[in-house]
């Protein structure tokens, strides 16, 4: 795939734009609360340009890219994490993978996403339908990958990732 650079023609312009995408980790209350803040505007815009996605497709896959980026904050060395949504709605599903270096890649299973009428809000649950979320961790020192699987409860990438953490890893979480 030929990667498109939506930010500037020169290397200097591209590097300057890339400097704005950041991942910040922090701890509060003597380590009782961990947090990650991410700015991934450039990453999502490059994803949109590379996959030639429309607004709805960018919204869906972009949220998954950001979720994978946030989840990659807990990885080390050559570890990878894969997020897979399999669902019955028009999206059909998506796959996103991230590594410990913050590199994210992914794709939608159904492009373009068919809509019956113009959207009047950002509720994407009708496009997901029923289905499952699988999170697979490929840890460098492990012989086999670890996979956790939960039913889609909300039809929302952020809420379903938080539900995965609560259900599968017993870690109360929030993605916003």
Regions found by a protein language model. Give the residues of each.
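General detector of N-terminal leader/presequence modules that precede the first folded domain
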Residues: 2-176
């Amino acid at each position: 795939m030929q990667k498109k650079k939506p930010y500037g023609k020169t290397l200097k312009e591209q590097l300057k734009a890339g400097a704005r995408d950041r991942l910040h980790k922090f701890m509060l209350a003597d380590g009782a609360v961990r947090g990650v803040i991410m700015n991934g505007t450039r990453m999502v815009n490059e994803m949109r340009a590379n996959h030639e996605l429309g607004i709805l497709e960018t919204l869906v896959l972009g949220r998954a890219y950001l979720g994978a980026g946030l989840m990659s904050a807990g990885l080390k060395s050559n570890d990878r994490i894969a997020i897979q949504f399999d669902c019955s709605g028009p999206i059909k599903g998506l796959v996103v993978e991230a590594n410990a270096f913050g590199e994210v890649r992914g794709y939608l299973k159904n492009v373009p996403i068919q809509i019956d009428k113009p959207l009047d809000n950002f509720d994407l649950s009708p496009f997901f339908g029923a289905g499952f979320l699988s999170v697979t961790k490929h840890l460098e020192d492990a012989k086999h990958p670890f996979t956790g699987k939960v039913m889609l409860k909300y039809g929302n990438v952020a809420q379903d990732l938080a539900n995965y953490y609560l259900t599968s890893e017993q870690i109360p979480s929030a993605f916003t």
